[in-house]
Amino acid sequence: MQNAGPLDPLTSGGILHAILGTLIMIAIALAVVIPLGVACAVYMNEMPGPFSRFVRTISEAMTALPSIVAGLFIYASLILILGFDKSGFAAAMAISVMMLPIIIRASDVVLRLVPGSLKEASYALGAGQWRTVWHVTLPTARSGLMTAIILGTARGIGETSPVLLTAGFTAALNVNPASGPMVSLPLATFEFVKSPEPTMIARGFGTAAVLMFLVLLLFIVARIIGGRGPGNLSKSQMRRRAKRSREDHQRFTKREASRSDSVQPTPPSSSSSRSLDFGDSP
């Protein structure tokens, strides 16, 4: 878009810089919020107490946080206090503030739906609490956790004001999130639509259509992944489970066969044979 003016036709310019900027910001935000959000949800479920209730209260309050407040917080902390430039990284941090409570609350609900019988079976086999979380709870709730992450991504991909405050606006392509302004699809839509030229307004509606398509695609993927409840396996997972069951059966069969071969019948001793002969004599 840096070589296209307001009066140029729609065949010139494009929104590649906005698409790549959006993907880069969302990727950085996901790298931050996925481990932090899932860890908070696991902590609230596995370690009940005053601090877990405090974390739940904060996460619930953050869901009603205006996006402009998140943008101002990152702008004041990273740009004004720490001296960072306006960049895609700062915008990703602001977006992560908006995504984090969504992922925490959705993951908390999903982890609560994991059947307690699965955890009790793991404890009965001798597994500890965190080993049960890693090998039983999280794999069982994997589809729900993926849905929570996708819903949080759909929330963050449509934020405008945090990006405007922390990343600025540019018409040039910038793939370096550490320096220089970077634009997203919502911010590009806002900048295009506020222009008085019909061509720029048309560009804004086209950018909004691309953004709507991305959000709709995310919701479709979330619906497909979230169609299964916790513990309900997909076809590929059922095939893997059947394969592992056959392997376990073969391994236990070989073990029992080796044990039976190692145990040989002991011949009777001489003293016992003599006693038997003595008993048989008249």
Enumerate the language-model features and the residues they cover.
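Interhelical loop and adjacent transmembrane-helix boundary motif
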Residues: N3-P9, G13, V163-F213
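Alpha-helical membrane-interface segments at transmembrane helix boundaries
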Residues: S12-I24, I28, S52-L65, Y75, ...
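Hydrophobic alpha-helical transmembrane segments of multipass integral membrane proteins
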Residues: L20, I24-V32, L36, C40, ...
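Transmembrane-helix boundary motif in ABC transporter permease subunits
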Residues: A29-S59, L72, R223-G231
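Transmembrane alpha-helices
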Residues: L30, A106, Q129-T166
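Generic hydrophobic transmembrane alpha-helix motif, especially the helices
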Residues: E60-V97
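Glycine/proline-centered hinge or cleavage motifs at structural transition points of membrane proteins
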Residues: P66, L125-G126, P139
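C-terminal transmembrane helix and the adjacent membrane-cytosol boundary/short C-terminal tail
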Residues: D108-R112, Y123, E191-R259, P267
